[in-house]
């Protein structure tokens, strides 16, 4: 968590500096000093690149921390910005389908940390699932989404009423899947290394 907070703080500083430099570049351009405006603009772009790099490192750190504690059929998106979370879920779904898994629990939270407690992450994930025609259902505690993966010919309806606490294990499908044989740490590392290096922008956090 300390590493995550450190990188987010560094990214925030670079974002502030970038905003200041772009503003000064506009002032210089308005004053007719195009050379100075270009110089300031280039410095601002460098700040933006550093900001993105810090955010990628923060996303990777929090993802590894949260998901190393999850079951193989879960993905925890706490701490990720919206676009980071969407990319992580897309990558995870692709990996699950390749392994022949038939479901995935997506932990999206309840929006308690969002401005005015308005959920932003769940709608973004749901929109992505609907765009890809992937079936899903909300779970009892409202902080999770159960996804029926396309690889499953007959997805098993989960008994949502039996879910008590987030840390309790979920019932497995009646047939075994490759996920049961894959170490959770390997799944987490696969997502973090393949997904987060592709991030380009960062949006509101959940």
Curated annotation (Swiss-Prot):
GO-annotated molecular function = ATP-dependent polydeoxyribonucleotide 5'-hydroxyl-kinase activity; endonuclease activity
Compartments where found: Cytoplasm; Nucleus
Among its keywords, does the record have Amino-acid biosynthesis? no
**Keyword set includes Nucleus:** yes
User: Which InterPro entries does the annotation name?
Assistant: DUF1771, Smr_dom, Smr_dom_sf, Smr_domain_protein
Gene Ontology CC annotations of this record: cytosol; nucleus
According to UniProt, the name of this protein is Smr domain-containing protein C11H11.03c
């Amino acid at each position: 968590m300390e590493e995550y907070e450190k990188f987010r703080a560094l990214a925030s500083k670079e974002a502030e500096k970038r905003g200041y430099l772009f503003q000064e570049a506009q002032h210089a351009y308005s004053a007719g000093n195009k050379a100075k405006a270009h110089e300031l603009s280039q410095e601002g772009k460098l700040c933006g690149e550093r900001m993105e790099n810090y955010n990628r490192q923060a996303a990777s750190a929090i993802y590894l921390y949260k998901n190393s504690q999850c079951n193989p059929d879960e993905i925890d998106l706490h701490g990720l910005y919206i676009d980071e979370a969407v990319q992580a879920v897309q990558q995870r779904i692709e990996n699950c389908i390749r392994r022949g898994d038939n479901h995935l629990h997506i932990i999206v939270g309840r929006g308690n940390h969002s401005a005015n407690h308005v959920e932003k992450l769940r709608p973004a994930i749901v929109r992505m699932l609907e765009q890809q025609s992937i079936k899903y259902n909300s779970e009892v505690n409202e902080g999770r989404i159960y996804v029926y993966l396309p690889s499953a010919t007959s997805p098993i309806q989960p008994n949502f009423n039996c879910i008590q606490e987030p840390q309790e294990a979920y019932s497995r499908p009646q047939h075994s899947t490759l996920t049961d044989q894959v170490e959770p740490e390997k799944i987490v590392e696969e997502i973090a290394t393949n997904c987060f290096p592709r991030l380009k922008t960062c949006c509101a956090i959940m």
